[in-house]
Amino acid sequence: MGNADERRFEVLRAIVADFVATKEPIGSRALVERHNLGVSSATIRNDMAVLEAEGYITQPHTSSGRVPTEKGYREFVDRLEDVKPLSAAERRAIQSFLESGVDLDDVLRRAVRLLAQLTCQVAVVQYPTLSTSTVRHLEVIALSPARLLMVVITESGRVDQRIAELGDVIDDYQLSQLREMLSQAMGGKKLSAASAAVADLVGRFRGTGGLANAVGRSANVLLESLVEHTEERLLLGGTANLTRNSADFGGSLRSILEALEEQVVVLRLLAAQQEAGKVTVRIGHETAAEQIMGTSMVSTAYGTSGTVYGGMGVLGPTRMDYPGTIASVAAVALYIGEVLGAR
């Protein structure tokens, strides 16, 4: 790329930085005063004219200054050479705050609240997806001789409890047999494989009384737990940040709020995150969702040891501090994975 192109990109970079900071359209005089671009105001005006002609900036009707377009933001993001990481103190604070979570739900609630505070945007965290979860432990507890509590714990820390009404009583020996069979069928398996193994048990133990009845009834309860789509759950934090930035969304704020409430659009974007440590930035129309066209979404996956549990990120206006937001999303995702992996 030639010197003129490099210089024009520096002008674009300065326009993005100033517009994000001030919310005001940027003129050539302001660029000369605030940035050491090493060229005259006339040269900057010429560069801005080229950037506008190429679609990187535009002129609002009510101002003589310029603002970045979606294309301009994309060029800015694509050419971010280094994203400054959070400070050591900030990283320690994040880690400590998440480690204080008492269970999966608490850790994720803390994460979404923290991410919203760090970025001043709406934070979204997807609950761990069933398709990638593994059964860590199954507990079968007798509440009475004919009533069992089934507790399934996944490696991500998700806990699901169900009651199995047996109809007939079983003794302690049969309870021990049942617990061992179910644990062997499910333990260490992905939930899809665990579901198949439990279904196989139902086929092998057909009967109306004793152990066969207990296996059938408890297995059916477990199948209900395993096949429920709890991945279609989304935690939100910082929704009030949208209203504080309402001017950035024009008349689309209501549709954005509706999309967040319905969750489907955001979950689809998060489900596309399949690689922990890789941050994706979607700007405006790149979301491919009409309800949130006026937003940008910065997202990544979180998980442990090569296993992706779900997606997370932030949603906000295209006028966003992209470097800071990328760093915050990456850091919180990293520490969620570390905290969940240590449990």
Swiss-Prot record:
Gene Ontology molecular function terms on file: DNA binding
GO biological process: negative regulation of DNA-templated transcription
Pfam families on file: HrcA
Keywords: Repressor, Stress response, Transcription, Transcription regulation
Domain of life: Bacteria
Gene3D superfamilies: 3.30.450.40, Heat-inducible transcription repressor hrca homolog, domain 3, Winged helix-like DNA-binding domain superfamily/Winged helix DNA-binding domain
Family stated for the protein in its record: Belongs to the HrcA family.
NCBIfam families, alphabetized: hrcA (TIGR00331)
PANTHER family given in the database record: HEAT-INDUCIBLE TRANSCRIPTION REPRESSOR HRCA
Function: Negative regulator of class I heat shock genes (grpE-dnaK-dnaJ and groELS operons). Prevents heat-shock induction of these operons.
UniProt name for this protein: Heat-inducible transcription repressor HrcA
Organism: Mycobacterium leprae (strain TN)
